[in-house]
Design a protein with these regions (language model features):
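Catalytic-site neighborhood detector that most strongly recognizes the C-terminal catalytic loop/helix
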Residues: 7, 73, 125, 176-202
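Short, basic (Lys/Arg/His-rich) helix/loop patches that form interaction surfaces
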Residues: 23-36, 45, 94, 109-127, ...
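Short, polar N-cap/turn motifs at the start of nucleic acid-interacting alpha helices
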Residues: 59-66, 167-187
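DNA/chromatin major-groove-contacting recognition/catalytic segments
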Residues: 24-27, 78-84, 165, 186, ...
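Basic, Lys/Arg- and aromatic-enriched nucleic-acid-binding interface segment
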Residues: 1-55, 63, 74, 90-91, ...
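Basic, alpha-helical nucleic-acid-contacting "clamp/cap" segments
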Residues: 19-31, 63-122
């Protein structure tokens, strides 16, 4: 039978807790600059893996600490790596934290001025292959004992942390590039099932 959209997500899709996220950030201190910037960008903005791979320097504004997400890189065996619009077909401008901006500044200064892409291949100025983060995340998770560490889980984590800290769902939806805020709310609810269950238990015990 077909699962409903509101079916519980498996563990690997749930968000990291605030404590787990802090541990991830500590682990990043030992990682290469490119990956520190990539992972922190995903946590900070909730952007998709392909959107980060498709980010160009012309879309980074250091004066306003914003990025414009206007392309998404995808890969299929038939087409290879190709460029599309973001998933909802719309460009969006997202602000980044001062920590992310500083890492991006450092990354920009480490690259030749002719490089267009923010995240490049190790031996080429071409954009990072969209499958590369998935492989790197697997190694990162094994190295630091983090289960189910993959890019999309950081997207769930970004939404979870934002809403938990008081951001309204409509604003978070716009930041994530969701065309419907109910998608964001489902993501938050699924990512925080354990917390919601504890709230229910607290109410019943009151």
């Amino acid at each position: 039978p077909r699962k409903s959209k509101d079916a519980a997500l498996p563990t690997e899709h749930k968000a990291f807790t605030a404590e787990e996220t802090r541990y991830i950030l500590r682990c990043l201190d030992s990682e290469p600059l490119k990956w520190r910037a990539f992972i922190l960008l995903l946590i900070d903005t909730g952007c998709r893996r392909g959107e980060a791979c498709g980010l160009q320097w012309q879309s980074v504004d250091f004066d306003t600490n914003t990025i414009t997400i206007e392309r998404n890189l995808q890969y299929t065996s038939e087409r290879g790596v190709y460029e599309t619009l973001p998933k909802n077909g719309k460009t969006r401008v997202v602000d980044v934290s001062s920590d992310v901006a500083a890492l991006l500044q450092e990354l920009r200064q480490s690259q030749p001025v002719t490089v267009r892409w923010v995240f490049t291949q190790d031996d080429s100025p071409e954009p990072m292959h969209p499958d590369t983060p998935t492989r790197y995340f697997q190694r990162f998770g094994k190295r630091y004992g983090i289960e189910h560490f993959h890019p999309h889980k950081l997207r769930h984590t970004s939404a979870s942390l934002a809403i938990t800290n008081g951001a309204d769902v409509v604003s978070v939806a716009a930041r994530l590039g969701h065309s419907d805020s109910s998608t964001t709310l489902r993501m938050y609810a699924h990512a925080n099932e354990d917390s919601i269950r504890r709230v229910g238990q607290t109410v019943r015990e009151a």
